[in-house]
Amino acid sequence: MDGILLTLVVLVLGISLAVVTSASGQSPVRISGHLVNMGLALVLMVLIANVPPHLLSKVGPPLYATGVILLVGVALFGEIRNGARRWLDLGFIAFQPSELLKLALPLMLAWYFQRNEAVLRAKHFMVGGILLLVPFLLILRQPDLGTALMLGASGFYLLFFAGLPWKVILGGATLGAASLPVVWGLMHDYQQRRVLMLLDPASDPLGAGYHIIQSTIAIGSGGLFGKGWMQGTQNQLDFIPERTTDFIYAVFGEEFGYAGAILLVCLYLAIVARGLVIAARAPTLFGRLMAATLSLNLFTYVFVNMGMVSGILPVVGVPLPLMSYGGTALVTLLLGMGILMSVATHRQLNKS
């Protein structure tokens, strides 16, 4: 078990519990639910941390196949919530299969590239691109642009660390920039409105601009040291939307100020740095790819959420890692932390 990483994770979870308590109005249901989610996620993290990476790598293909099948099931039989078909209801449980792909995709790609490590060619990167594209398009169809983009970033990180040539990266970036007008035309109306709201959220203060306006007021009013725990007026008067989930950073910023925000960012950066150290020390390609990708995934989620809440990025429904209320996202994230700890703990292993 990596003590440094574990300590950092527990510190952020402790802050999360305090902020969820405030954001929920001290709701016993929310607080107890968050404690249960944290307890379950931590137990699973410890269990995964004790599984050798070469065994974890074998989970990649079946987990990926299961995830893709479930995404197809969502497209055919999924439950529509808030205008999007993202949920699969099995009767005894309803869940979003896209969460499964956040781990299944990097596991699959890392397994594939380690398996072909000695003979890596352009065709292997093409196969990797296809493995990324299948779940990306299925999630984009739901539509869930935020999750699709995060999954795309995760796949790109892994391909990059596996040795994707720079000429391919630059060519892809040029093609992507040239196709922006086409992408804009394919976006749904509500997605276009979210982007346009960045320019002038005050043009629709009670509609599409409401989230950005209220969250930026909360963060700005927190000042240097904040208004104090459970003393945030924007929070307590119910102005901040989704304040226990996607916009929990606005609650934190209002109550703990810029000083608290800097501390939280430093904790996140420390987790990312520790993950990259683990990646550099990993003895196998699988371990290096997983550790580096999971670390940058965390950084991306934090950057996008904080940027979204601060009004510098569109609202895309991305939770703040380790902070936002929500069982599935927290379990998925701590399973990833468990994989990081597994790579750190089991340095002497056989290549699968």
Predicted features along the sequence, with ranges:
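Hydrophobic alpha-helical transmembrane segments of multi-pass inner membrane proteins, especially
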Residues: 5-211, 250-310, 335-339
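Glycine/serine-rich anion-binding loops at beta->alpha junctions
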Residues: 91-101, 141-143, 223-228, 315-332
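Transmembrane helix boundary and interhelical junction motifs in multipass membrane proteins
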Residues: 144-149, 227-232, 243-245, 262, ...
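Long extracytoplasmic/lumenal interhelical loops at the membrane interface
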Residues: 223-259, 282, 286
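A juxtamembrane structural motif centered on a specific transmembrane helix
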Residues: 304-352
